[in-house]
Amino acid sequence: MAELTINADDVRNALNEFAASYEPGNAERVEVGRVTTASDGIARVEGLPSVMANELLRFEDGTLGLAQNLDVREIGVIILGDFTGIEEGQEVHRTGQVLSVPVGDAFLGRVVDPLGVPIDDLGEIKAETTRALELQAPGVTQRKSVHEPMQTGLKAIDAMIPIGRGQRQLIIGDRQTGKSAIAIDTIINQKANWASGDVTKQVRCIYVAIGQKASTIAAVRQTLEENGALEYTTIVASPASDPAGFKYLAPYAGSAIGQHWMYGGKHVLIVFDDLSKQAEAYRAVSLLLRRPPGREAYPGDVFYLHSRLLERCAKLSDELGAGSMTGLPLIETKANDVSAYIPTNVISITDGQIFLQSDLFNANQRPAVDVGVSVSRVGGAAQVKSMKKVSGTLKLELAQYRDMQAFAMFASDLDAASRQQLTRGARLMELLKQGQYSPFPVEDQVVSIWAGTNGHLDDVPVEDVNRFETEFLEHLKHKSSILTTLAQTNVMDDDTAAALKSSIIDFKKGFFGEGDNHLVGAGHEAHDAISEGEVDQEKIVKQKR
């Protein structure tokens, strides 16, 4: 048998040749983790030492998960889907991708889930690209001050709490006080801008529904479709039946879709309905991940949850395309308590709040905006000049009216000036009432507010103020060019005011009966004028309830 010999030079040469031809890129490293526990939409996974925060993981049955807690021995994973098929011991693989959603104009008119998957049975969506959910908000130098108006079509808001493009305006109030109605009216009011075809005017809208009933979301979609607003709106839906992880991610998915348009130089309006339910979902997820609870059992970073979301709404500088994203977050309060944890957090983050009062809503004052508590911190710079001029004294007059109304409940007799304040205040409150899904063009609002603040409605009975307003606006549309002039110039000058005064005097001649102070219209009978003695005896008496 021949003796086996090893030549050291041959071994050395073979190793050198292998090292020279070796390409590290051809080697593939695969990390595999295993599920240790899975329940309540949360899985704990051992292994995967190189996993990234917010990386997508894939379970054996194809379900995706989101890596959250990166502990030394295991990972806390939010399961994005049905967790019933995930069991202990199953393999988990990395995808190497952070959570992102598809974006693009193809999403307009569609209803998608928080992962960007269509759920409206209208086929697949061809996305232009994808965008990560966790993105840094624009910095200070990338922004521009808010200076363009975002019209809601609601007189009470556009006159006293104006909103600008790029602003974050909180809508806060108890349940069933009309919060969603204001947001939907604002979306519907963008129809004229969309129909104009002018990119600088058009506003793409995103409605993020968090934790609502599926029937409610379907009703919102139908309302938008009936009013011609669905074609420029995307609905991101995470109904109450969704896992808590989906409700937590839905607002970020909506903002990612909006940011794509904003950085493309377009204008976006995004509605978060509502962030109270997102905070509750995040609390549930955090407690299941065994994170330390804080005040009201919310995790310590619940402020950061909302701040990093709302800071993405901005008016970009001209160098970045001058696009904007306006945010309307909604918060539900309990018993009108705005001093609770989540409401105070979001109030401190946003640029103002619209507070809806349940007492006003129940008194049929809708929209039920409490003007005394509501404020817009930056929207005043974006208000059109004509509206700023006519509404300058409106907030003060309403405040004086509320004070006098409280005083009149206990006073048996009032002087003429006090009665005048009550007369005008009651008519201004009636003027601010507005039906749902019937937003007003800004020029119509200017004329209505002008008529109220200048005393032209003082001789109109309160119950006929809305009819007077409707018929006067129709009169102007058919017999005057004042509305067209206001729409084009947005300026209420002396000539326009004089023409308006002349028009309203002429209109009253046909609207009022001859020689008396009562209206004669459809369903109204003429009466004799009240004598001066009877007027002097007018008293305001507190009504017993």
Curated annotation (Swiss-Prot):
PROSITE patterns: ATPASE_ALPHA_BETA
Residues engaged in binding ATP: 173-180
Catalytic activity: ATP + H2O + 4 H(+)(in) = ADP + phosphate + 5 H(+)(out)
Lipid bilayer topology: Peripheral membrane protein
Primary localization: membrane
Gene Ontology, cellular component aspect: plasma membrane; proton-transporting ATP synthase complex
E.C. code: 7.1.2.2
Site residues, Required for activity: 374
Enzyme class: translocase
Subcellular localization(s) per the UniProt record: Cell membrane
Cleaved signal peptide residues: none
Record-level Gene Ontology MF annotations: ADP binding; ATP binding; proton-transporting ATP synthase activity, rotational mechanism
The entry's keywords: ATP synthesis, ATP-binding, Cell membrane, CF(1), Hydrogen ion transport, Ion transport, Membrane, Nucleotide-binding, Translocase, Transport
Summary of subunit composition and partner proteins: F-type ATPases have 2 components, CF(1) - the catalytic core - and CF(0) - the membrane proton channel. CF(1) has five subunits: alpha(3), beta(3), gamma(1), delta(1), epsilon(1). CF(0) has three main subunits: a(1), b(2) and c(9-12). The alpha and beta chains form an alternating ring which encloses part of the gamma chain. CF(1) is attached to CF(0) by a central stalk formed by the gamma and epsilon chains, while a peripheral stalk is formed by the delta and b chains.
Family, as annotated: Belongs to the ATPase alpha/beta chains family.
Function: Produces ATP from ADP in the presence of a proton gradient across the membrane. The alpha chain is a regulatory subunit.
Name assigned to this protein: ATP synthase subunit alpha
Species annotation: Pseudarthrobacter chlorophenolicus (strain ATCC 700700 / DSM 12829 / CIP 107037 / JCM 12360 / KCTC 9906 / NCIMB 13794 / A6)
